Amino acid sequence: YGIEIEEKAYGLATTNMLIHGDGNSNIKFGSCFDCKDFIKQSDPVIILMNPPYNAKPIGIPATYKANWGKAKDGKEDPTKGLVFIHYLSDIIQEMNEEREKNGLPRKTVKMAVLLPVSTAIGTKNVIQEEKIAMLEHNTLEAVFTLPNEIFYPGASVSACCMVFTLGEPHVKADGTMKETFFGYYKEDGFKKKKALGRVEQFDENGDSKWKAIEEEWLRLFRNHKSVDGLSATAEVSGENEWLCEAYMKTDYSKLTEGDFQQTLNNYLAYLMKEGKIYES
């Protein structure tokens, strides 16, 4: 099952399914906001989503724009994609209410969603309101900071992956909450190649660097293990930052003189840009 509003992406998705022998892919062409019944009928257990980060507000239901102010008539979605998670959360909540009326137990749904880092950092205005609303009925299981230019040669936005359990409140009835796992997953063993994109690298034995890195990342996540410079766990609310960089400890053993010099260069460039010092 799937929903895609961009025509070329929809064509690629359906063609790919046909090539792999699936003649009934159940991929809908259109806006997810017009596919509520389709989503409910699919009865999802796992949702993978990459919402648009700059969707036009005109295509978003008015009920989700009540607190947007002038932005509701603007050119871009001020939530940077969070509103799409809110919408799916509401559908799962509605499904659970219907299940309870029919004497059935509530269900939970795992969701992994790609979003710009700005949504994880945001602690003000509309983005914070969306984060607070999300945790009312859902649990933030993990947030992974992804490699720079993950979409190369496409969009250059810095992205993260958020993992939620929909249908399970972040704060339990007794007031406690589960610690969220944060991964600083910047180095994945791929390198940028012009005209090729991000290319997988191999070691001297011909083994995939990514495969070894992937296994380590999954091990840390499954065990909720904190490793300096790579991962951390913390209790968070919608008012906090949702990025590993805010909680992990620095692994000083891996710092080099080059890292120190680069930091100084970046700071010097910032001072010059702000007009606080001038090149002589």
Features from the language model and the residues they span:
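A conserved structural/catalytic subdomain of Rossmann-like adenosyl-cofactor enzymes
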Residues: Q41, L48, Y53-S280
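Conserved S-adenosyl-L-methionine
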Residues: Y1-I46, N54-I58, V117-S118, E130
